[in-house]
Swiss-Prot record:
This is Large ribosomal subunit protein uL13. Pfam families: Ribosomal_L13. Keywords: Ribonucleoprotein, Ribosomal protein. The gene is rplM. GO terms for cellular component: cytosolic large ribosomal subunit.
Length: 150
């Protein structure tokens, strides 16, 4: 009888990937990035361990949404004070802090526990094409072609 091999954290190889978000559909991009962060693209995937890779997302300011979501989709945050609710549309938040849109979409697709917080730390999002992670030699990650919006 074969035994199931559980990889130890010392044996897990961590790679760095760079993903270009230009003209990509937000949800489809977030799904693939969350899968790589979890390590589901590896044969050594284990649900309760961090076996995933680091992901650098560039051009977050050029991500797209379909339909009327640019004006209808709302992002809410609360300061914790009475009357402290702030509401902002997708278009307004994309003008102000485009990284937050991609981060929030990906974070919602990760586990909502300590493991999810640990996985989220391996995500780096930048609004331009430049990033400071050249020393890690990130490999370009090819997204599914159906994720792009023409």
């Amino acid at each position: 009888m074969n035994k199931t091999v559980v990889p130890s954290l010392n044996t897990v190889e961590r790679h760095w990937y760079v993903v270009d978000a230009e003209n990509q559909c937000l949800g489809r991009l977030a799904t693939e990035v969350a899968s790589v962060l979890r390590g589901k693209n590896k044969p050594t995937y284990t649900p309760h361990l961090d076996t995933g890779d680091f992901v650098v997302v560039i051009n977050a300011d050029k991500v797209k949404v379909t339909g009327n979501k640019a004006s209808d989709k709302l992002y809410r945050r609360h300061s914790g004070r009475p009357g402290g609710m702030k509401v902002e549309t997708f278009a307004a938040l994309q003008q102000r802090i485009p990284e937050r849109i991609v981060e929030k979409a990906i974070k919602g697709m990760l586990p909502h526990n300590a493991l999810g917080r640990q996985l989220f730390r391996k995500l780096k999002v930048y609004k331009g094409a430049e990033h400071p992670h050249g020393a890690q030699q990130p490999q370009p990650y090819q997204l599914n072609p159906s994720a792009s919006i023409k």
